[in-house]
Amino acid sequence: MSDDQGDAVEASSEADEEASTSPDEGDDRDPVAAVAERAENDPASVAAELVALREEAAELETERDDLESRLKRKQAEFQNYKKRQEKQREKERARATEALVEKLLEVRDNLNRALEQDADADIREGVEATFRQLDDILDGEGVEAIEPDPGTETDPKRHEVLLQVESDEPEGTVAELHRPGYEMAGKVLRAAQVTVSEGPSGDSEAEDDADGEDGDE
């Protein structure tokens, strides 16, 4: 046999040997069985891999929890930001409305004074119509009048005391309303101007006592 023929036979034998030990032979094996076989043959290596996988899974869970926590915080911060912005817009709208209403109240005062001055009938009719329209606008904005009756306890938050006068009303109560006040959404826009009673004068009390004595006789 020649050298070339000998080499060919040897190469063929090696190819057959490689084919018999090819990895493709194990491709169809059950993965679980393969792991079981590895665990049986090299338990320490498989155990180490399991520990590493558990640690990696724990790290991933921690990272996931951290991301979820951060996301929830960001969502809460955004919701709080939206609420603050909405409250700020509401305050700005309320301030703008209050400023407009205060100007309208000044116009109302002027119209009221015009009505009290016995204007001509033609003018009075127009003023009264404008007065009613203005009151409708104020009502639509939720504006309410502050008009305390005589004898009402004074409230420094709602009443502006012009002076104290002698009257038959109890001491410290409203004697007379001079100009109505107004409030909107629970906030006083303008306090009512009032006089406060000091109680009846000494002469009045003496007269009352005298009348009582005369009645007894």
From Swiss-Prot:
Region (Disordered): 1-44, 135-157, 193-217
UniProt xrefs under SUPFAM superfamilies: Coiled-coil domain of nucleotide exchange factor GrpE, Head domain of nucleotide exchange factor GrpE
Family: Belongs to the GrpE family.
Function: Participates actively in the response to hyperosmotic and heat shock by preventing the aggregation of stress-denatured proteins, in association with DnaK and GrpE. It is the nucleotide exchange factor for DnaK and may function as a thermosensor. Unfolded proteins bind initially to DnaJ; upon interaction with the DnaJ-bound protein, DnaK hydrolyzes its bound ATP, resulting in the formation of a stable complex. GrpE releases ADP from DnaK; ATP binding to DnaK triggers the release of the substrate protein, thus completing the reaction cycle.
Entry's Gene Ontology molecular function annotations: adenyl-nucleotide exchange factor activity; protein homodimerization activity; protein-folding chaperone binding; unfolded protein binding
Biased composition (Acidic residues): 1-28, 136-152, 204-217
Entry protein name: Protein GrpE
Signal peptide: none
Pfam families: GrpE
